[in-house]
């Protein structure tokens, strides 16, 4: 089982090697990188390429590790017992299976995505150490050991909001997705917009990287935001010339709200455009 890329995802040689290293070592692949660099999409594309069902667990600040294993619905069982329900006799009716339970008991190998693990509290990764390492956990309510029939291919993504514990890191294979350079970005754009005119691509790419390289920018635009912007430019049939307008009444290129998400960054970009015009 080897990942060799897909036509829908521009994967570097290093990234493909990392995916295959995680498969060989039978360890989770921990993927870090800026938001919008394709971390989540990587899991989706690998699962598709290897013909594996994909289970996804999207982490929030309130998510607890136990939810990934199972939850016992004691309230419903108490209510049903008061109503004299027959199903109350079987405790399995009140076990809500989490994504790890589903992955471990699947009839075939699956891919498992634990998305944005750094959003949870600091103890969250530690609480999953044993389960991800040994691929098993115990359900005390039903008194059964849930052990993986087939070891899932685990992807874990992080935006670096919090540092992850060393003990957790030791159990993963790590890959950092670097922000694409202009050449790689052009390949990514070509996958999504194969018929895009070179003039519009060149003008949009120049504007995009000018914005990203602005000193003092609070939030740099991501790959996904560039793709959103291009989609809007095409939908509105905006020509390449409009992105490099010399009209002093036009402060910034059209639809730049797809790239810049606060007023300070818009103001910074307006100053850059003004300086560039004065230097022509």
Locate predicted features:
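C-terminal regulatory/interaction module of P-loop NTP-utilizing enzymes
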Residues: 1-280
